[in-house]
């Protein structure tokens, strides 16, 4: 067997093993992801997986509804927000400690400036793991 044939056989075997061990329920895979922004007075979803809708509840505050609910609210999420201006002002994606909600059906996220005021962003990227 040539080296090329051996490598091809090994690659096929690795692919088979990975495929049998990692499926859609694997905890390392994102259950939800979305890239959206507030542009022209409306929420625009650029791309998404398992997202039914994104609703702007107030300036800089959004509710992301899942198309298929999580089993519970014991998931983790991470998000990044882009500055809507070109002046070096940063945006931070956060959850409010007092009234931000995280349920099996949706998660509330907020976009804030470094001056701690809520503000919209033209691009927010959210990923949810469970």
Give the positions of each predicted feature.
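Terminal beta-strand-rich extracellular "head" domains
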Residues: 71-101
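Extracellular receptor-binding modules and their adjoining Ser/Thr/Gly/Asp/Asn-rich linkers
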Residues: 2-72, 104-130
């Amino acid at each position: 067997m040539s080296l090329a044939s051996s490598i091809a056989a090994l690659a096929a075997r690795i692919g088979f093993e990975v495929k049998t061990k990692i499926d859609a329920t694997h905890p390392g895979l994102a259950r939800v992801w979305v890239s959206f922004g507030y542009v022209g007075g409306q929420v625009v979803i650029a791309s998404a997986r398992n997202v039914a809708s994104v609703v702007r509840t107030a300036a800089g505050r959004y509710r992301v509804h899942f198309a298929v609910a999580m089993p519970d609210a014991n998931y983790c999420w991470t998000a990044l927000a882009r500055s809507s201006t070109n002046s070096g002002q940063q945006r931070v994606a956060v959850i409010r400690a007092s009234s931000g909600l995280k349920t099996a059906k949706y998660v509330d996220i907020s976009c804030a400036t470094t001056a701690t005021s809520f503000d919209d962003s033209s691009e927010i990227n959210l990923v949810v793991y469970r």
